[in-house]
Amino acid sequence: MISKDKLKKLVGWEALKYIKSNTIIGVGTGSTVNYFIEALSSIKQQIEGVVSSSQHSSNQLKKLGIPLYNLNNLNDLEIYIDSADEIDLHMQMIKGGGGALTKEKIIAFAAKKFICIVDDSKQVNILGRKGPIPVEVIPMARSVVSKSLICLGGLPEYRNGVITDNGNSILDVYNMNITDASLLEQRINNIPGVVSVGLFAQRKADIALIGTQKGIKILNSN
């Protein structure tokens, strides 16, 4: 039986096949992405550099000698590679377990192509049944946002002791019945004090590389 870590490593290396020479790549955050960053270091001479979604990923990229770029200084971004906490058959995702959801969402929006790399434990039929939806909030709005999330049917829990790279707080929302992920994403985003929500339904993955016991399964959004 192939271990979960081995599956993560396999999809991390598989993602290299989608990278063109002399381009700048968006890179996400998480344990699967850590394997991708290791793989990326093997072709670092062939790429221009990387836009990173978190300080954690930036630190790893710097150690490996991979140049970092500011998204504001780029005209376009060809590709973004990141993992997910959950992904469904429609390529909609829950992300943000590592707390980097806002920057992840910005880079995903900016990129022409979004590739999600996961092991098959992350693939679900319905989002939100296995874990919470992370919501990044302005600290002073935590209570107000929590009340609004309860009105939407959720059970928000403050992620104690966690401050995002943007200086904000995280609410993990349990018990949310997700029948229309895109609509729910919009509703949560519209709550004053919400910075971003870890539902990636409006900007879905274009390609998913899923590590399974039988090999790598590839899903396309179209």
Swiss-Prot record:
The protein's annotated pathway: Carbohydrate degradation; pentose phosphate pathway; D-ribose 5-phosphate from D-ribulose 5-phosphate (non-oxidative stage): step 1/1
Nucleotide-binding among keywords: no
Domain of life according to the entry: Bacteria
Annotated keywords: Isomerase
CDD domains (UniProt xref): RPI_A (cd01398)
Gene Ontology biological process terms in this record: D-ribose metabolic process; pentose-phosphate shunt, non-oxidative branch
GO cellular component labels: cytosol
UniProt: substrate binding residues: 29-32, 82-85, 95-98, 122
Similarity comment text for this entry: Belongs to the ribose 5-phosphate isomerase family.
Assembly, per entry: Homodimer.
Task of the protein: Catalyzes the reversible conversion of ribose-5-phosphate to ribulose 5-phosphate.
Protein name stated in the entry: Ribose-5-phosphate isomerase A
Lineage, top ranks: Bacteria, Pseudomonadati, Pseudomonadota, Gammaproteobacteria, Enterobacterales
Name of the encoding gene: rpiA
